[in-house]
Structure formats: C-alpha cells, structure tokens
Amino acid sequence: MSLWFLVFLSVLQGVTELFPVSSLGHTLLVPALFGMHIDKHAPQLLPFLVALHLGTALALLWYFRARWIALISGFFAQLGGRKNDDGHLMWALIIGTIPTGIVGLLLEKRLERVFHDLRIVAVALIINGVLLWVGDRIQRSRAHQAPEKMTFKQAFFVGLAQIGALIPGFSRSGLTMIAGNVAGLTAEKAAEFSFLLGTPIIFAAGVLELPKLFHARDQLMDALLGGVLTAIAAYLSVRFLMRYFEGRGRLASFGVYCVIAGVFFLGWFMLHPQPV
C-alpha cells in the first residue's frame, strides 16, 4: 500500500465513521471512483482495518472521557442501589448495544458480500440522505427530552437503527441520530448518544480482530500509522460535529450531500460498471 493511499484511507475512515454519511459506503465508492478496488476481506488489509477501528474508538473515548467516567461511576452506584441519571443512561447504552452486537456477529460478512455492487451502495447512500432529511424534520417538530430520561424501549429502538449500517451506504451515526430524534432528543443530544452508543461497537470491531494485527508484523508500522491518522481525523470530526449540533446544525445538510453524492456515484457506476 502506497503512503498516500494509506493516508487517504485513514483520514476517510476517521471522518466518515462519525459524519452521518456512511464510512463503509465511502470506503467502497470513493477509491473505486479513482480506479482502485479494495477487497475488505483481503488478509493483508485486515490488520490495517483493525488499527483504523481502534483509532476511531480511542478518539471517541478520549473526547468523551469525562462523560464515560461519570457514566461508569453512575452505573456502579446504581448497582449499589443508588438510582441516578448517569447509571440509567449507562444501562440504556448497554441495552442499545445488544441488537447490533448480535446481528453484526451473525450477518455482517453476508450483508457486505451481497451489497458490494457499487450501484446498490450508491442507492443506499441516496436513501440514507432522504432519511437524514426526514429525521431533521422530526427533530424540529417534536418536544425534547434529555438522554438520561430515555426509556429502555427507546434505547433499544435506537440500537436497532444501528443494524441498518451493516449495509454499505447507510450511516451508523446517521441512523442512530435519526432514531434519537424520533425518541425526542435534540440534535446535539442525539449526536452525543449516537457517539456514546457507537464507541463499544467500533471498539469491539477492532478488538475482535486484534490477534491478526500482531500476527502481521511486517504490516505493523502501516497499521500503527493508519491508526494514529484515523484517531486524529476522528477526534477533529467529533469535535466539529458536537460544536456543529450545539450551534443548531441540521442533519438535513448531510442529507443533501448524501443524495447529491449518491446520484453522482450511481450515474458514474452505471456508465462505468465495476466487477462485483
């Protein structure tokens, strides 16, 4: 892997994993646009992808470190019989993680193979954009509540939304923000809940494949560099997004981008078919 391509993929992963625009979709579509094919199941690529996921997860953990300390403290306090908002939210995050954890382990590889037709990925990106616009409209028309007041049923519903992101073209953060809007969260709080909810999933995606990173010693330096670059890109992305939504930023803006990008990619790959 050339240095510039390593840098390109690392930054692309760090940004699109958190922006509601589908990291997997962009990882497939953008390189193919420039004539580069990425086999996500190639043995030599696995250590690199492990490092990218770990870099993203570490960036999220660092950005929300104070929040996680409060959540974990509240969780153990609640186990000790002292009810509190942080403990309740921690339970909500645990419940929200369950659907994707189970379905991801069972179906992720199968879903990725089925949807590697880039034209289908482009269509999924367009649908993702429409859903972001709908979610924005819902958020602006509903009464709002704090994440700590979410019911466990609502948390499970938000967790279910993550399953859609197993299909390339749909965004994990985007779908969970939309579900958070439906549950009555503001744009800012829906984004925060989405990032907190996604951290264990992203971290687990890296940890489960961690042995492959250490078995590929000849690729360790590339993987480490990719992980560091992804962590930096992810940290800057989450900081930007939280400020964006705090300043009344809207999901609809990302929806417009996804529709335009999806239409462009669909047209391009209709004219320039790629091997599936």
From Swiss-Prot:
Keywords, in A-Z order: Antibiotic resistance, Cell inner membrane, Cell membrane, Cell shape, Cell wall biogenesis/degradation, Hydrolase, Membrane, Peptidoglycan synthesis, Transmembrane, Transmembrane helix
Top-level taxonomic group: Bacteria
Localization terms from the record: Cell inner membrane
Membrane topology reported for the UniProt record: Multi-pass membrane protein
Enzyme class: hydrolase
Catalytic activity annotation: di-trans,octa-cis-undecaprenyl diphosphate + H2O = di-trans,octa-cis-undecaprenyl phosphate + phosphate + H(+)
InterPro entries cross-referenced by the UniProt entry: UppP
GO BP: cell wall organization; peptidoglycan biosynthetic process; regulation of cell shape; response to antibiotic
Protein name (record): Undecaprenyl-diphosphatase 2
Note: Bacitracin is thought to be involved in the inhibition of peptidoglycan synthesis by sequestering undecaprenyl diphosphate, thereby reducing the pool of lipid carrier available.
GO molecular function: undecaprenyl-diphosphatase activity
PANTHER family per record: UNDECAPRENYL-DIPHOSPHATASE (PTHR30622:SF4)
Protein EC: 3.6.1.27
Family listed: Belongs to the UppP family.
